[in-house]
Amino acid sequence: MRTPVFTGNCVAIATPFDANGNINYDAFGRLIDNQIEGGVDAICVCGTTGESATMTIREHIAVVEYCVKRVNHRVKVIAGAGSNDTSAAVYLSLHAQDSGADALLHVTPYYNKCSQAGLVKHYEYIADRTELPIILYNVPSRTGVSFTAETYRHLSQNPQFNGVKEASGNFSLLAHTRFLCGDDFYIWSGNDDQVVPMMALGAKGVISVASNLIPEVMVKMTKLCLDNDFEAASKLQIKYMDLMDALFLEVNPIPIKAALNLVGMEAGQLRLPLCEMSEKNLETLRSSMARMGLL
C-alpha cells in the first residue's frame, strides 16, 4: 500500500524576484524558513504560484536545488516538473530527482489539449524514466484538459503515482475518483477555499497558495480535518473566506505576491505577462488583510 507524500498543509511557494527581475534568493530563503517555522508539512517549489512558466530551464533547476538545500530535510520538498513537452518534463524530473527532492508535481500538458489516452501515455512515459513519487495536477481552468476518474483509476495501478492535486473544483469527480481508486491513491485540494469539503470527502490536505501568507492557519485547518473535527475546521474555513477570495481577485500569483509585499516579505515583482494588481483590487486585498489582523 502506498503512503502519502505528505498529509496536512503543503505551501505552493512563491518565487521572489528583485527589482531587475532576477530571482531573489535571500528573500526566497527567508520565505522558506518562515513557512517551516509556521509548521507546514511540505513545500511545493516551481509550481504555478512559483511562476515556473516564466523561468528558464536553468533557473527552474537552480530554484529547485536551492529549495532542497535550504529546507535541508526539515520538511518534504515537492518539485514542480510539469511541461506540455513530455521530454522536457522528464528532463526537469531527473534534475529534481538528482537534487534530492522528495516527490514530483506534474500538471496536465497545457495548450496541446491531448486526449485521455495522450494523458496516460505522457504520465507513463515520465514514470518509466524516473523514480520519485509523482503527484498528478489537475487544473483544467489553466490547461484546457481534465482527468476523468477512469484515467485516474488506470494510472493509480502504478504505485509511483501517489495521487493528485485536484484543482478542478469538481466534487463529483473527486467522489468518483475515491470510489474507483481506493484509499491509497491520495487526493489533495488545490483550492484554498475548498479545503474542508474536500477533506471531508477524503482528501489528505492541501497544496496551498494562502499558506504563503497564513501558514499557521492552513496547518491548523488541515490538522482539524485530519483529526475529524470538521465543525471547528469549517468555522476556520468560513472565517478566512473573505481573505481567500481577495487572494484570487486576479490570477495567481499576482495577489499573493502583493500580499507578501504588504507584510514585508519581499516577494518582489512579477514577470510578464503577469503584472501588478489593479489599484482597486489591491485596496480590496489590503482591507481584507487588515480585517484579519495581518496589517
Where is each model-derived feature located?
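Short Asp/Glu-rich motifs
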Residues: T54-M55, A89, S115-Q116, S146, ...
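Alpha-helix N-capping/helix-start residues
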Residues: A19, Y25, I57, A149, ...
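C-terminal alpha-helical cap/extension of soluble enzyme domains
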Residues: V5-P16, G38-V40, A200-A203, I207-L295
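Catalytic alpha/beta core domains of metabolic enzymes, predominantly
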Residues: D128-R129, P140-F248
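Active-site beta->alpha loop and helix N-cap motifs at the rims of alpha/beta catalytic domains
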Residues: R2-V11, T15-G144
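A general structural signal for well-ordered alpha-helical segments in protein cores
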Residues: F28, H60, V64, A89, ...
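Short helix-capping segments at alpha-helix termini
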Residues: K69-V75, S99-G100, T130-L132, N158-Q160, ...
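Short, amphipathic alpha-helical "lid/cap" segments that border enzyme active or binding sites
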Residues: Y25, G29-I32, A149, L282-M289
